[in-house]
Amino acid sequence: MGRAKIKKKSMFIDMTAMSDVTVLLLTFFMLTSTFVKKEPVEVFTPASVSEIKIPETNILQILVDPAGKIFMSLDKQPDMKAVLEKMGEEYGVKFTPEQEQKFIVASTFGVPMKSMPKFLDLPTEKQDRILKNEGIPCDSTDNQFKSWVRNARAVNSDLRIAIKADANTPYAVIKKVMNSLQDLRENRYNLITSLKTTSEK
């Protein structure tokens, strides 16, 4: 006598709830994550025990690479546009609407004013390659760094200044940046550092 065959039943799992959770999580991370700006150079900040959080808005960030080149960034596009216009007036440099648009969407800037129009005409990939070898002048004969800070403050009085320098940046360069800020009576600023681990303390 043959054995009765048991019919195989197909399993059906309703994945609707799982897909809903996935979409919710994805939306949550997209809305709560902060945009990390692309920087022209890689900077390894020195370690410290300070846990003060830098504000995410109204920030003027000053980036100093190991070679002492200075770059800057503003977090608001209207501020970027207004500051560029003021710098153009101060240095007698005119910008086309296309050049202005390229500037305000850039995450970081750092070329001398006389080179700025030609720089902004370049494709983004070429700009990235050139920018890391430039830097904002900050010497006694041509301190454009001070002009950028002064005009940024004129555009947005609520700006917070943050300096992000590499651990191997020469102290003389940082001192020059700080002296320039003091000349403008900008005596309040944050130094961006990485948090020391327990083994480093």
In which residue ranges do the predicted regions lie?
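Hydrophobic single transmembrane helices highlighted by the model
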Residues: 3-40
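GHKL (Bergerat-fold) ATPase N-terminal catalytic module, capturing the glycine-rich phosphate-binding loop
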Residues: 2-3, 66
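Long, low-hydrophobicity, acidic/polar, solvent-exposed interaction domains
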Residues: 36-201
